[in-house]
From Swiss-Prot:
Glycyl lysine isopeptide (Lys-Gly) (interchain with G-Cter in ubiquitin), cross-linked positions: K244
Family according to the record: Belongs to the transferase hexapeptide repeat family.
Subcellular location: Cytoplasm
Enzyme nomenclature, EC number: 2.7.7.13
Organism for this UniProt entry: Saccharomyces cerevisiae (strain ATCC 204508 / S288c) (Baker's yeast)
Name by which UniProt lists this protein: Mannose-1-phosphate guanyltransferase
Protein's pathway: Nucleotide-sugar biosynthesis; GDP-alpha-D-mannose biosynthesis; GDP-alpha-D-mannose from alpha-D-mannose 1-phosphate (GTP route): step 1/1
Length: 361
């Protein structure tokens, strides 16, 4: 089987982290985000994976090629000279995706969930249509494009309603699909939207179905959702692979901690915390609902809450970081500083408080 991951472009919503590496290489749960997807595809029997890239492809190639052997897959990079939207990349990768005439998976690189690829493939083959969208249920469907089903045929999609003012359903497109190769014939080699241009044709032909996703789902393409997705991911690990989570007298709730991290016995970590390789946590530090990326240091008696601490950064003593603060690569926060919702660009030194949301350049 084959799969295409829409890696996309600049990752502006996740800046300042994406000023240093492309978004799919930002570590989520201590692994590059895209590795969660590559591993799930490989586990479902996918042997050919296409990464549709239009930003810094050379970095992606250098980082990901080494994983081919580990996961037993062929990784091809389909490089767009101009952004082609969500459908154009399928046309660009037509040679790989049409190989052996079997269905192929498509997924957005921002999506984190318990990828149900095997079940999705079985469901797709059983209904015999040309395409299947994975759907997830949401509490506030008025914020999204909602899937409405055909009354007579379960799971057959009748139409999409964009941001409905009245309740028509609570299932939305989760950004994971399986499609038959002939769907590529509906796509032109130009910037095209699969959601707005390709799927409506399949709906008209009564060839598009939806598959309900079980478990958690999150688009982690911006800091607030990255942190929310981390909470959901750790909850999922606690159920499926609890041995991966840290335990100890100073651990509260779910925490994923790299074994090379050095943490003071008087620090308190958790709930909902990820700590990367070679991180140092000082005495009396308190960290909740946060991610600390590799080679960073949190000095004594600081509070880190709802924050992403970027690589190689230092947080001084008696600091308080909260409110979805994001430190870029190699940031230094001086002692006794308060940051509330600051987005700090790489290589900055912060010696003044940031009491409200701001971009520090």
């Amino acid at each position: 089987m084959k799969g295409l991951i829409l890696v996309g472009g600049y990752g502006t919503r996740l800046r300042p982290l994406t000023l240093t590496v492309p978004k799919p290489l930002v570590e989520f749960g201590n692994r590059p985000m895209i590795l969660h997807q590559i591993e799930a595809l490989a586990n479902a029997g996918v042997t050919d994976i296409v990464l549709a890239v239009n930003y810094r492809p050379e970095v992606m190639v250098e980082t990901l090629k080494k994983y081919e052997k580990e996961y037993g897959v062929n990784i091809t990079f389909s490089v767009e000279t101009e952004p082609l939207g969500t459908a154009g990349p399928l046309k660009l990768a037509e040679d790989v995706l049409k190989k052996d005439n079997s269905p192929f998976f498509v997924l957005n690189s921002d999506v984190i969930c318990e990828y149900p690829f095997k079940e999705l493939a079985d469901f797709h083959k059983a209904h015999g249509g040309k395409g299947t969208i994975v759907a997830t249920k949401v509490d506030e469907p008025s914020k999204y494009g909602v899937i409405v089903h055909d009354i007579a045929t379960p799971n057959l999609i009748d139409r999409f309603v964009e941001k409905p003012k009245e309740f028509v359903g609570n299932r939305i497109n989760a950004g994971l699909y399986i499609l038959n190769p002939e769907v590529i014939d509906l796509i032109e080699m130009k910037p095209t939207s699969i959601e707005k241009e390709t799927f409506p044709i399949l709906v008209e032909e009564k060839q598009l179905y939806s598959f309900d996703l079980e478990g958690f789902w999150m688009d982690v393409g911006q800091p607030k959702d990255f942190l929310s997705g981390t909470v959901l991911y750790l909850n999922s690990l606690a159920k499926r692979q609890p041995k991966k989570l840290a335990t100890g007298a100073n651990i509260v709730g779910n925490a994923l901690i790299d074994p090379t991290a050095k943490i003071s016995s008087t620090a308190k970590i958790g709930p909902d915390v990820v700590i990367g390789p070679n991180v140092t946590i000082g005495d009396g530090v308190r960290i909740t609902r946060s991610v600390v990326l590799c080679n960073s240091t949190i000095k004594n008696h600081s509070l880190v809450k709802s924050t992403i601490v970027g690589w190689n950064s230092t947080v001084g003593q008696w600091c308080r970081l909260e409110g979805v603060t994001v430190l870029g690569d190699d940031v230094e926060v001086k002692d006794e500083i308060y940051i509330n919702g600051g987005k700090v660009l790489p290589h900055k030194s912060i010696s003044d408080n940031v009491p409200k949301e701001a971009i520090i350049m």
